[in-house]
């Protein structure tokens, strides 16, 4: 009986210690929201790096629980706005983010409906908000 209890306890201890340890390192970027509507009527990319600039993000219903005041000390935020489109099927997002010694390079991916593809006949204003977990200079391509 004691051997069975000891074997069970040993297996329990080994299985508990085998779990992965999280290094606590944040990813280079996080997509905070990607929406088909709600963006501006013109195409633009904006980098927010000051505390007063993120107040509008904190007031947004989709972002208020994702953006904290202290985030601006270690992060920048990027708004990617596709502009007004006459139909659905359009989106804007991040294809990749690369970090070099002195800057962060964001490659933007725009998606549009293909010729003849069925889409909704409603105006759309796609946008994406990205959190970059770095204070390096940001270059958008």
Language model segments and positions:
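Bacterial Sec-dependent N-terminal signal peptides
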Residues: 1-24
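Exposed, flexible binding/inhibitory loops of compact, secreted disulfide-stabilized domains
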Residues: 16-141
């Amino acid at each position: 009986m004691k051997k069975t209890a000891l074997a069970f306890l040993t297996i329990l201890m080994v299985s508990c210690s085998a779990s992965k340890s999280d290094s606590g390192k944040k990813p280079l970027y996080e997509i905070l929201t990607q929406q088909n509507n709600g963006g501006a009527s013109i195409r633009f990319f904006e980098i927010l790096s000051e505390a007063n600039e993120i107040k509008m993000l904190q007031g947004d219903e989709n972002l208020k629980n994702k953006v904290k005041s202290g985030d601006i000390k270690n992060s920048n935020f990027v708004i990617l706005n596709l502009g007004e489109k006459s139909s659905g099927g359009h989106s804007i997002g991040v294809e990749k983010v690369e970090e070099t010694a002195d800057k962060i390079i964001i490659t933007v991916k725009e998606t549009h409906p293909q010729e003849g593809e069925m889409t909704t006949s409603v105006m759309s204003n796609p946008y994406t908000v990205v959190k970059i977990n770095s204070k390096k200079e940001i270059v958008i391509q």
